[in-house]
Design a protein with these regions (language model features):
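Short helix-loop capping/hinge motifs at secondary-structure junctions, enriched
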Residues: 127-133, 152, 165-173, 251-258
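Ligand-binding pocket segment of bilobal, Venus flytrap-like solute-binding proteins
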Residues: 171-236
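Extracellular/periplasmic juxtamembrane helices and adjacent flexible linkers that interface
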Residues: 252-332
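Positively charged n-region of N-terminal signal peptides that target proteins for export
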Residues: 1-5
Length: 332
């Protein structure tokens, strides 16, 4: 009789075990760059629902935002991040070089671990009083430019390389003339913030400068918040900006969060997430969803791929390392 009761009790415990697992909470931290704040605020809500439905677990997601280069340095120096969603491949490579992410991470998710893309545009005051149409106009006397610092901001490096790509086409690859062009542009910079969101604040809220060189999504968010005050100008040449994502292996193995961290990044490619990315003015990598939003995104702009300049390792060494071209042309 006692054995029978024990067996029944054990069976009851085993039957309850899966249900009790449904009360578990797991937590992860996503270290990201400046202009993704609003997008991840929305995305995290749908991912929490997705994870609960899939596993029965609750998930708590902590966000950290800042200039991409600075964020990468923080993670490399010990900021615990289960996942990183940064502005460019090079910033994640710097975390890999610190021994926290395994080699080959770029192949772990589709499209070189880039679930969405963007490009670089200009935000100007309503009516475009300075008549800014293309990169040439940013080198004119009397035009105040706002852009972040490429030493700390991934978006700023995309801004710089978009201008470099324009100069490359304009001067047929003559680097002397290209450097002069970039020098003139940066001589017109009135404030060089540490990150993209800080640059937006300087231009939109503090009224500094005549033109903000910005992520496309950041410019559209400003338009959404201040519909009667600003307008967007898309230059003739820009860059295919590819923000990238990765699981931080050292952290997830220590915290036992690999499964949820991997799914967190995988789900960025889902149709539901791609719609949220488009709503926040990032370009979905799902072509069908991108075309659905063609009334928002200019799909005709000439987007140069960073691979044309040897990829981010080469670009970083040539342009943004100490004594690189940026240091050469930016005299402040």
């Amino acid at each position: 009789m006692i054995r029978k009761i024990f067996a029944l009790s054990l069976g009851a415990v085993l039957a309850l075990t899966p249900v009790q697992a449904f009360g578990k909470t797991v937590s992860i931290t996503n270290v990201s760059y400046d202009p993704t704040r609003e997008m991840f605020e929305q995305y995290n809500k749908i991912f929490e629902e997705h994870w609960k439905e899939k596993t029965g677990e609750d998930v708590e997601i902590t966000q950290s935002h800042g200039g991409s280069g600075k964020q990468a340095l923080e993670v490399a120096n010990g900021l615990d991040a289960d996942v990183v969603t940064l502005a460019l491949e090079y910033d994640i490579e710097s975390i890999e070089n610190a021994g926290l992410i395994k080699a080959g991470w770029i192949d772990n998710f589709d499209n070189d671990s880039s679930p969405y893309t963007s490009t670089i545009v200009f935000l100007v005051k309503k009516g475009n009083p300075k008549k800014i149409q293309d990169w040439d106009d940013l080198t004119r006397d009397g035009v105040g430019v706002v852009t972040p610092n490429p030493k700390t901001s991934g978006g700023a490096r995309w801004n710089y390389m978009a201008a470099w790509a324009y100069a490359d086409k304009k001067y047929n690859g003559d680097e002397t003339q290209m450097k002069d062009f970039i020098r003139k542009l940066y001589q017109n910079v009135v404030v060089l913030d540490s990150g993209a969101r800080g640059a937006t604040t300087s231009f939109v809220e503090n009224g500094q400068g005549d033109v903000l060189v910005a992520w496309e999504n950041e410019a559209y968010l400003s338009m959404r918040d201040y519909p009667d005050e600003y307008e967007i100008v898309t230059p003739s040449v820009s860059i295919l900006a590819q923000p990238t994502v990765a699981v931080v292996d050292e952290v997830v193995d220590y915290r036992d969060t690999r499964e949820v961290a991997t799914e967190y990044l995988n789900y960025l490619y889902s149709d539901e997430a791609q719609e949220i990315e488009a709503e926040n003015y990032f370009r979905p990598t799902n072509e069908k969803i991108l075309k659905k939003h063609s009334d928002v995104f200019d799909l005709s702009v000439d987007l140069v791929n960073i691979s044309e300049y040897g990829g981010w390792d080469e670009v970083q060494k040539k342009h943004f390392a100490d004594d690189g071209i940026f240091d050469e042309i930016y005299e402040r």
